[in-house]
Amino acid sequence: MFQKLFKIISILVIFSTNALADGEATYKSICMACHENGVSGAPKFRSIRDWAPIIKEGKVHVIAEAYNGIRKMPAQGGRPDLKLEDFSEALIYMANASGAKWEKPSEQEYIKIKNKLAKLNSKKETQ
């Protein structure tokens, strides 16, 4: 029983560590260009002041709005090939470095994010 529990916990730790590593890699290869120094008003990496109001909006809302494109940031960070999951991990990596305590979205949260994205996209089409 104890060994089985230990294996399950070990697997969870490995997956959460991998998600963090993936978020960091995506940040460094895509997001860092703007977020490292706050280019065009982008919230600066590790800036609690910049990120606090964003974090208050909630993980689901922020991921959907940002993935859709917000302020001067283009949709998907300007990378049409960037998957929602990879984008989410990078955003969570940045938010957590700036005071959030967010985890990778659950399946239910991804459903909410995708529903919000569908609404945002339908608004774009009618404008």
Write out the residue ranges for each language-model feature.
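Sec-dependent signal peptide recognition
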Residues: 2-14
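N-terminal signal peptide c-region/cleavage motif recognized by signal peptidases
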Residues: 16-18
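The canonical Cys-X-X-Cys-His
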Residues: 27-37, 90, 94
